[in-house]
Structure formats: structure tokens, C-alpha cells
Amino acid sequence: MLAEPINLQSWISENKDLLQPPVNNYCLHRGGATVMIVGGPNERTDYHVNQTPEYFHQIKGDMTLKVVDDGKFRDITIREGDSFLLPGNVPHNPVRYADTIGLVVEQDRPKGVNDKIRWYCSNCREIVHQVEFYCYDLGTQVKDAILAFDGDDEARTCKCGTYNYSRPN
């Protein structure tokens, strides 16, 4: 049986408490694609790499999508009302500010295709740590990877000697 439509504005006003750090996401729909509502502020420094595109629509407030584009770090501002389609395989870190709400759509992962969560050194910009996994639950797996990094001093220490953080300082 088909699900009933969801009024996003009503859902957001009734369920803001479900949008908790470090990722602040809640999965509304699953099956073929995952549709998430994501609130701010979030608390993360990781970059997500997945092989499929991600669609961002900013419902309330602005956000910054930090990306590594052809080897260069840069910021993309997605303003309230804007939509943006991020191609697959682009490392990205969505930075969400206080009292902001966005909608994100991600395609279900093909079998055998893994996601990566990586952290770049805050000093030398080299990859300090990376985990790879088959993503079947965006609601929990990204958060679990962030919490594991947060508790692993060895993973957080770069070859250059810099100690890195899972949350912005």
C-alpha cells in the first residue's frame, strides 16, 4: 500500500527534537532513495564520499557545502530556497547553521558499492583517517563512524603530528 503524503512544514514543526547532533538527520522515506530532513547546527568535520549523486534543497536558512573539487577545497553556499545536485564521488561536508532545515535525497547504494567517511588534517590537508562501508542506513551509520573517530586518538593524529577533531573547534 502506498504511503500518505507528508506535509513537510507540519512535520518539521512537530519533530524538530528528532534532529540531533552530530548529523542531525531523520529519514522520512526509504526504498530506492532515502529522503532526509536535516537540521542545524550540526557538529562534524568529516567528508562523506559516495558513488551516487546527492540532491540538496534548503528549506530554511543557508548552509555551506564544503567540497574537495578536483583536489581543491572550496565552499558552496546553498541559500534558503536553493537546490543543488552534487555529483557522485565528490568528498563533501555539509555545514548546517543554527535554526536551519534542509532536505537531502540520496540514491540507495548498488550492491558492492561502498561509501567512505574521511577526515582531512586541519593542518596539512592530507587524509588523516578514512572508513569504508556499505551504506544501508543513513540514519545511523554516518553517526556511528563519527562517534568511533571521536573516540580513537590514534585515528585522529595525522602523520604531521596534528591532533584532529570530529567536531569543529
UniProtKB/Swiss-Prot annotation:
This is 3-hydroxyanthranilate 3,4-dioxygenase. The gene is BNA1. It comes from Meyerozyma guilliermondii (strain ATCC 6260 / CBS 566 / DSM 6381 / JCM 1539 / NBRC 10279 / NRRL Y-324). O2 binds at R44. The keyword Oxidoreductase applies. A divalent metal cation binds at C121, C124, C158, C160. Catalyzes the oxidative ring opening of 3-hydroxyanthranilate to 2-amino-3-carboxymuconate semialdehyde, which spontaneously cyclizes to quinolinate. GO terms for biological process: 'de novo' NAD biosynthetic process from L-tryptophan; anthranilate metabolic process; L-tryptophan catabolic process; quinolinate biosynthetic process. Pathway: Cofactor biosynthesis; NAD(+) biosynthesis; quinolinate from L-kynurenine: step 3/3. Fe cation binds at H48, E54, H92. Signal peptide: none annotated. It is found in: Cytoplasm. It comes from the Eukaryota. Its EC number is 1.13.11.6. One of its GO terms (cellular component) is cytoplasm. One of its GO terms (molecular function) is ferrous iron binding. Pfam families: 3-HAO.
